[in-house]
Structure formats: structure tokens, C-alpha cells
Amino acid sequence: MREGLAVAEPQYEPDDLDRLLQLRAMYEVRGPGLLTWPSVPMPVVRTASIMFTDIRGFTRLTERFAHDPAGLLEVLNAHLKKVLRSIAICGGVVEKFVGDGVMATFGAGGEQPDHVDRAMAAAIGLIGANEALNRKSAADWGFRLEVGVGIASGPVVVGAVGSADRSELGVLGDVVNVAARLVTNAGPGEVLMTGTVYRAVADRLQSELTSQSAVRGRSGSLEIYRMALLGGRGELT
């Protein structure tokens, strides 16, 4: 995707997205425009980009809908549809839902040499799509949904997690933990990324170095970059 990262509308039906929201992972879906995990020997080690998303202030939002849980689900699903669409357009796979956010992989289910580009394009796309949703939520619901993103790239292992009685396909590795930690520190409309991710797109992306930083739950420090998409705008040229 290095040439022209313009995000086009996906070619699949809304029903596919509705079905997707009821599943744990995108690879379980068989539908036009939705990726499936290929049949490959397991486990397999690949270099991939991992992305986590998270709604900022979701706890306060749940309090707002304390007496209308169905309304909360409506709001969350409206947001997740935007997120899933951006990920699918860029060739990513939703590995699982994590509370109000998602964990998506690029390059884990199959070789994608441009997995970093794809992850960054998806992040830019989903924040922009969420901003469009905010125009509706502000008018209809009286509040905004703010989303943060964390991205890390590196080696991961893809394989069955569990036992013969019950197992599921999982993606494991240090970069998964790093991306999960980064998203907790990403502000509204921000993408936090590791130095590996930044250097892969630095010549085409404006970003700010936030300094060497310790990430809770791991030893040592990480080179972390922050990209702020004010108003949900950004591009990868």
C-alpha cells in the first residue's frame, strides 16, 4: 500500500458488518470484502503490526446510560462499525474485541510486506470515520465519542491457544503487549506508536517524539511517537 493509501468504500453488505459484531474474530466470517485466516501450518511466526483501539472516557459514558443499557449498546456498535470498516478496507483482521475497543492485526494472518502502512492507514481512517460519527452523536445524543489508538510492530506467533477441549486462534508476542499498553496512554484522536512503526512511515508522516518512556508492566524504556489527528484529519502520503 505504499503507492496511494487513499481509503475507498468497501464492497460488502451492511449485514456482513452486523454479523461481524456478533463474532469474536473476523477470520470466522465468510463474506465479500472480509478477510479470512488462511489454512497454514500452526504455529507460525510472522512479522506483523498490532493495533489496539479504545474509547476515551467510556466509564463515564456507561454512567450516562446507566438506565438505558440498550442505548449504550447502540452507541458502541455504531462506533465499532466505523472501526471495523476502516480495518477491513486496509486489509487488517480483527483478532478480538477488548471491552469497548478492538485488537487488530496486519500481516499476522498472511504475508503483508506493507503491514505498517496498512495499520497506520487504518488508524487514520478510523479516527476520521469516528469524527464523522461525532457529528451525529453530538446532535442526536449530546456527546462525542473520542478514540485513541496504539500500534506496535515486530515478531508474533500465530497458533491455537487452549486445549483439545477448547481452543481459539491467537496472536501472541511482546509487540501485542506493547500496543495494548500504548493505547491506554493515547489521548482523544491520538495514535501512539513505537519507534519501529514511526521509522517505517517517517518520510510520509508528521509525528512528534514524546521521548524515551517506561511502559508499565515491562522493564526498560521504549521510543514512543505520538500522532495527533486534530479533528480526525490525517494522511499517509
Describe the function of each predicted region:
Residues V98-G99, A139-G150, V191-G195:
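Acidic/histidine metal-binding catalytic segments
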Residues E74-G92, A108-V149, D174-V175, A180-V183:
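Alpha-helical scaffold within the catalytic cores of cyclic-nucleotide enzymes
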Residues A152-S153, V161, D174-G195:
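Catalytic/regulatory signature loops of cyclic-dinucleotide turnover enzymes
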Residues M1-A48, L205:
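Regulatory cytosolic signal-relay segments
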Residues T105-H115, V149-E168, P188-E190:
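Catalytic strand-loop-helix junctions within cyclic-nucleotide turnover domains
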Residues V116, S167-L172, L209, S213:
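Allosteric regulatory "coupling" segments in signal-transduction proteins
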Residues V156, N185-T237:
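Cytosolic regulatory/linker segments at or just downstream of nucleotide-handling modules
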Residues V40-A121:
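Catalytic NTP-binding/metal-coordinating core of nucleotidyl cyclase/transferase enzymes
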